Amino acid sequence: MTNSNRIKLTWISFLSYALTGALVIVTGMVMGNIADYFHLPVSSMSNTFTFLNAGILISIFLNAWLMEIVPLKTQLRFGFILMVLAVAGLMFSHSLALFSAAMFVLGLVSGITMSIGTFLITQLYEGRQRGSRLLFTDSFFSMAGMIFPMVAAFLLARSIEWYWVYACIGLVYLAIFILTFGCEFPALGKHAQHSQAPVVKEKWGIGVLFLAVAALCYILGQLGFISWVPEYAKGLGMSLNDAGALVSDFWMSYMFGMWAFSFILRFFDLQRILTVLAGMAAVLMYLFITGTQAHMPWFILTLGFFSSAIYTSIITLGSQQTKVASPKLVNFILTCGTIGTMLTFVVTGPIVAHSGPQAALLTANGLYAVVFVMCFALGFVSRHRQHSSPAAH
């Protein structure tokens, strides 16, 4: 594979995460405007965004098999057509049913693109370099999550209709579409060139189960925590601005942490540093929940920094449990993480209704403790050392 081809594929991976980050995180910015557009209360409008999450979940789950049937380049190009149709549907329709369908299609497109992006990184890079590259790729999710809400605020402040925000997000997919030209993708399944030697099917091992549970608990814990921090802070008497600043501080340090750890991870055994980071994150979250108001910004900043590498490290370790990175295995762990996203309000909503925001934060803290236990247990069964040692960079 030529170096220019590798660079193009890597940029497709970066932009695939930016696309999903933009679609998921911009929701909160435009929800009120969309509710006004359809003359609905915000509470009932928020339910329609479940179609976006459902699309992401279904596409990541199905793409484990789809990758072996439909070439990756064909998927990305067809995805561009679907993206154009979905954005056009948002622009020219006043029907709530069509809006929900367009959101579902956007979810499908971003889920397929993100799973392809993750798979490309696991194919292009080996050993410890894979972990650092995947972490840098994941930082594009957070970066888009910072940039596109600002774009949305800029457009909405000038009374420009909300659907132009999605047209701007579509430009990210346009860049992916352009990059597919003159670019060779790894072939899979029936499209792959088969060698004379029979392909040995590898068993995943119990380590994959530990990592899948860790992925689900981590995402559910993280989103359950950060979703209720503003309510918890307001309950302590903090202003709305100060409560919002806590969330901004978390994501800002999360992004800086991703950049820092994309360099740091190369020098450590991934399972060991993951266990340390999961333990530190659980302790820092507990200190945030039980600490004084004066110390809360510091605890959430350090929590964001030290927890930033956890999810990507889980995916990387998963890809290293087999000798050859398996798209089905990587997508299985991604699917478990996405299920965590879907369950966020299903799990935390009733807890908050019954016992208040602090109970939701303590539940999230308990989930982080489960992540630590899973990562610690993985140390006894992980195969990553025997699979990554020859290729460590």
From Swiss-Prot:
Q: Which residues cross the membrane?
A: 11-31, 51-71, 78-98, 101-121, 134-154, 162-182, 206-226, 245-265, 273-293, 298-318, 332-352, 361-381
Periplasmic topological intervals:
32-50, 99-100, 155-161, 227-244, 294-297, 353-360
Q: What is its main location?
A: membrane
Mind telling me which InterPro entries this protein's record contains? Answer: MFS, MFS_dom, MFS_trans_sf, MFS_TsgA, MFS_TsgA-like
Q: Name one Pfam family in it.
A: MFS_1
So which residues are the signal peptide here? none
Record-level GO cellular component terms: plasma membrane
Q: Name the Gene3D superfamilies on file.
A: MFS general substrate transporter like domains (1.20.1250.20)
Give this protein's Gene Ontology molecular function annotations. Answer: transmembrane transporter activity
Has UniProt tagged this entry with the keyword Transmembrane? yes
- Protein keywords: Cell inner membrane, Cell membrane, Membrane, Transmembrane, Transmembrane helix
Q: Which cysteines are joined by disulfide bonds?
A: none
- Could you tell me which residue ranges are on the Cytoplasmic side of the membrane? 1-10, 72-77, 122-133, 183-205, 266-272, 319-331, 382-393
Question: PANTHER family of this UniProt entry?
Answer: L-FUCOSE-PROTON SYMPORTER, PROTEIN TSGA
The record's family statement is: Belongs to the major facilitator superfamily. TsgA family.
Which protein is depicted? Protein TsgA
